[in-house]
Regions:
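Sec-dependent bacterial lipoprotein signal peptides
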Residues: 1-23
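Short, low-complexity N-terminal intrinsically disordered segments enriched in polar/charged residues
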Residues: 20-48
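Structured segments of extracytoplasmic/periplasmic soluble domains
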Residues: 41-49, 57-61, 138
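Exposed beta-sheet edge and beta->alpha loop/turn motif
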Residues: 97-158
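Short solvent-exposed beta->alpha transition segments
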Residues: 36, 51-105, 111-112
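Intrinsically disordered, low-complexity segments enriched in polar/charged residues with Gly/Pro
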Residues: 6-7, 32, 81-84, 119-123
Length: 158
């Protein structure tokens, strides 16, 4: 009797584990690995000012913001970028999914980057700052959804 109860318990546990694996524990759409890789790629390109390369990681509605950022790069900014010894680096801190399952916010830390200032002002070198990147599903993939240029509350070191 004990063997059949134990066997039944193991069978139920195995069935539950199988169903859990098949249904997954995701409460959101899309692929987590794709999301993280694309957040990293977008942020690395964006904060190193490779704006055309960021387009594939953004929603279509984000393109005007990227064009705006690119149009505000001045000669002095380019010289400062070239003078930097190291590229900007990115660390993903957290990704929070919206209740709708098709929106998310990525919290990132960016180090050693030039941050654009107001129009007509040179960019400022920043040691470290945190940013929140809104995301949404577009064409069955996670994309950065820019509603403005990424901004942080941290001050520059210049």
């Amino acid at each position: 009797m004990k063997k059949s109860i134990l066997g039944m318990g193991i069978a139920v546990a195995a069935l539950a584990a199988s169903l859990y694996g098949l249904t997954g524990c995701q409460s959101h759409e899309g692929d987590d690995n794709q999301l993280e890789a694309d957040v990293d790629s977008f942020a690395t390109y964006y904060f190193n000012w490779h704006f055309p390369k960021t387009l594939k990681y953004c929603t279509r509605s984000s393109e005007p913001w990227l064009r705006y950022a690119a149009s505000n790069v001045h000669k002095a900014d380019v010289e400062r970028l070239r003078a930097k010894e190291e590229d900007a680096t990115v660390e993903i801190n957290d990704i929070t999914f919206g209740n709708d399952g098709v929106t998310a916010t990525a919290s990132i830390t960016v180090r050693n980057f030039l941050q654009m200032d107001s129009i007509g002002q040179e960019a400022h070198l920043v040691d470290e700052a945190e940013f929140l990147l809104p995301m949404s599903m577009e064409d069955n993939a996670w994309k950065i959804r820019m509603v403005n240029l990424p901004r942080s509350g941290k001050r520059s070191r210049d």
